[in-house]
From Swiss-Prot:
Membrane topology classification: Multi-pass membrane protein
Gene Ontology process terms (BP): protein transport
Protein family per UniProt: Belongs to the major facilitator superfamily. Proton-dependent oligopeptide transporter (POT/PTR) (TC 2.A.17) family. DtpD subfamily.
Subcellular location: Cell inner membrane
CDD domains referenced in this protein's UniProt entry, alphabetically: MFS_DtpA_like (cd17346)
Source organism: Klebsiella pneumoniae (strain 342)
Protein name (database record): Dipeptide permease D
Keywords: Cell inner membrane, Cell membrane, Membrane, Peptide transport, Protein transport, Transmembrane, Transmembrane helix, Transport
Residue stretches in coiled coil: none
Protein role: Probable proton-dependent permease that transports dipeptides.
Molecular function GO labels: dipeptide transmembrane transporter activity; peptide:proton symporter activity
Amino acid sequence: MKTTSSQPRAIYYVVALQIWEYFSFYGMRALLILYLTNQLKYDDNHAYALFSAYCSLVYVTPILGGYLADKLLGNRMAVMLGALLMAIGHLVLGASETAPVFLYLSLAIIVCGYGLFKSNVSCLLGELYEPADPRRDGGFSLMYAAGNIGSIIAPIACGYVQEEYSWAMGFALAAIGMVAGLVIFLCGNRHFQHTAGVNRQALCARRFLLPNWGWLLVLLVTAPLLIAVLFWQEWSVYALIVATVIGLAVLARIYLRAETDKQRKDLRLIVVLTAFSLLFWAFAQQGGSSISLYIDRFVNRHIMSYEVPTAMFQSVNAFAVMLCGMVLAWLVKESVGGNRTVRIWGKFALGLGLMSAGFCILTLSARWSAAYGQSSMPLMVLGLAVMGFAELFIDPVAMSQITRIEIPGVTGVLTGIYMLLSGAIANYLAGVIADQTSQASFDAAGAVNYSIDAYIKVFSQITWGALACVGVVLVIWLYHSLKVRTRRLAVE
């Protein structure tokens, strides 16, 4: 390939696929908790448990998806197969109104598809560049920005279709989006000829009684069924425990094999950053569960005579990420000097502080609802926007530190462990937190009366919890700042 200032043509097909994958995933996610409570009439406890189990397992399966791509399928085939499975899953989800058994199966199919897609689309993009190609960073930035476009549009479009037509049509729109992305991607197939394809030799090699392609088919059939059983029996927590134990064991092994003090110091930093990221995302993931139900029940969503669908509020977060990303880029540019560790903790303190501020606004909103029956929509939008801005100071900072580690061959493993803890485990904890809002009573007619006091309590506790994290992070920041200052004075 020639290295020019323009991007490889293949990237635009990857970007299109990424837009539609985000559209599909976040469109469905915006509807799911509302579908479980409003349409299937699940109580809040059951809905939160299933929602958090689903959001947790989508961060576990990419580990297996990456392995299958490396050994058998190649990134391109894995991505296409994952997109197809997600589209099928969304269609099956629409049928769960008439046959509830399809609910667990559909979520399991989506989890499997996400595992094949998410772990490999970035690797496929990386294959488009030579290792030293200066266009690489720009390509990844383009894909990230494009994904946010999809996640902004999806809740608006799917929420509108669900409100005007049906839940099944809302989920079908998510499926159509995924199919559209896959068709566009296939149209550019000729631009991916230089990327790694299916490993035919490995597929045909026999292992035990079957060739590997036979075992792959068995896996594609049994994995969704097994995951569906995990959802049905509420056993997903056991899968998370096993994955976490394995992840921590691998992390300990990497630490013990580190050769220098600097490597061990960097690993300790990553571990502490991951712990704070886990707490941050346990708070932030309330957006798809407890916050969504709070908006549906206690926020005045009317603009003139039009009632804004609850699902549309999920777009606020993605829009804030895109808009405030430019501010973050300026902040990074203006603060390139100084000690890197000090900057890292400063950004984490800012991110957690913004999360606390966002939930403080939500607490005020909930108190307003308690006093006047309903809260105002602008106050809700402000709180969600502040929380979206907070995200920019957490994940990018932690991921940047992981990629800087000077231990050969562990970056991918550390990234997977980070996603497991800050993704899967954080989503499980988010479900535990959200469950504290599921306090309700019944009136004489049998109608459900939801407790606004429960939302006030949970939002307030998160506000103070995030603020406590800020205090701890500031102590760490101050320690490193004084350490750097002392070192400079000693040199002078």
